[in-house]
Amino acid sequence: MSHNTFGHLFRVTTWGESHGPALGCVVDGAPPRLPLKAEDIQQWLDRRKPGQSRFTTQRREPDAVKILSGTFVEDGIEMTTGTPISLMIENVDQRSKDYGDIVEKFRPGHADLTYFLKYGIRDYRGGGRSSARETAARVAAGAVARAMLPEMMIRGALVQMGPHKIDRANWDWNEVGNNPFWCPDAKAAAEWEIYLDSVRKAGSSCGAVIEIVASGVPAGLGSPIYGKLDAELASALMSINAVKGVEIGDGFGAAALSGEENADEMQSGPHGIEFSSNHAGGVLGGISTGQDVVARFAVKPTSSILSPRKTVTKGGDDTEIVTKGRHDPCVGIRAVPVGEAMMACVLADQLLRHRAQMGGSGRNE
């Protein structure tokens, strides 16, 4: 199996490479008669596309999406038909010549070596299939998933850049769109601008932590043991390029709490059961509680840097390498909409599976 597909009932297959003619995805399992046109998908792709500030790669890709199948116009409204939805995004600004020096060399920190060891062949141009360019297709698929989740709000924010964290007391969702970092803390965003400018000018890179919050998630999504909502969400986020860690709710921070501190106490309220806190991140026993579902993931520093690094050639000889081309000094910035998309896809899949198993018999129905 090549493992280019994820999901169970809402299934997403992505295809394409960084420097190929195009990339895209096939989404299978979306219900019929969902209003969906290219503009609905484009608005989310525009949030991820490169070249929007000096802090992201200057590769100029419009990321214009084309719907090739799976929709039909009826009564003047373009809607899904219930058949596979094929989406394509053309690559228009490849510069493969930038990678001529690494034809025989493996870039440290990249998937060059492991792809070669596994397949015996690799696309060295921008990393081929392992490039973060592949995530454009995930964002497109996430737009389809969002169309299935009108009662949910899925938002992401950058909460740490390099060693610099936000002050959670300053969290303001309205600030997220007011800076190039998707940062909810205006003071931190101003500090990050100075920090990342210094990183960028030095030809280096830094990592980041992204937080994704889904509101309006009904109780009951997910299944015990092997179909846990948090397990599948962790898997989906971990599959994003450069991600090295995932946590749900307080995550690793829960290890420092006492049982009294960590347990989210409950009480009856005017609208049902209410929680005093959300250390669990909206998931207990693998099943959603009805609270916000909260996840964070850590992105490593971009491996493409200007400093010479030691490596080996395909023939096994020691050498040095300097990575050329256009790269993100902090790939975590553009990972925010990607994380949102993966959250949306997992929730859409879990919603379909919940309905298939429970019908209208669940307590939450």
From Swiss-Prot:
Q: What does the record's cofactor remark say about binding? A: Reduced FMN (FMNH(2)).
Q: Which reaction does it catalyse?
A: 5-O-(1-carboxyvinyl)-3-phosphoshikimate = chorismate + phosphate
Q: What is its EC number?
A: 4.2.3.5
Kindly list the positions annotated as binding FMN.
R129, S130, S131, N241, A242, G285, K300, P301, T302, S303, S304, R326
Gene3D superfamilies, per the entry: Chorismate synthase AroC (3.60.150.10)
The UniProt keyword set, sorted, is:
Amino-acid biosynthesis, Aromatic amino acid biosynthesis, FAD, Flavoprotein, FMN, Lyase, NADP
GO BP terms in the entry:
amino acid biosynthetic process; aromatic amino acid family biosynthetic process; chorismate biosynthetic process
Keyword Amino-acid biosynthesis found: yes
Q: Which InterPro entries match?
A: Chorismate_synth, Chorismate_synth_AroC_sf, Chorismate_synthase_CS
Highest taxon listed in the record's lineage: Bacteria
Q: Does the keyword Flavoprotein apply?
A: yes
Per its record, what are the GO molecular function terms? Answer: chorismate synthase activity; FMN binding
Check the record and name the Pfam families matching this protein.
Answer: Chorismate_synt
Name the pathway it acts in. Metabolic intermediate biosynthesis; chorismate biosynthesis; chorismate from D-erythrose 4-phosphate and phosphoenolpyruvate: step 7/7
Name of the top EC class for this enzyme: lyase
SUPFAM superfamilies this protein is in? Chorismate synthase, AroC
- Please give the function described in this protein's UniProt entry: This reaction introduces a second double bond into the aromatic ring system.
* Record's subunit section: Homotetramer.
The family classification in the record reads: Belongs to the chorismate synthase family.
Q: What is this protein called?
A: Chorismate synthase
What is the organism of origin for this protein?
Parvibaculum lavamentivorans (strain DS-1 / DSM 13023 / NCIMB 13966)
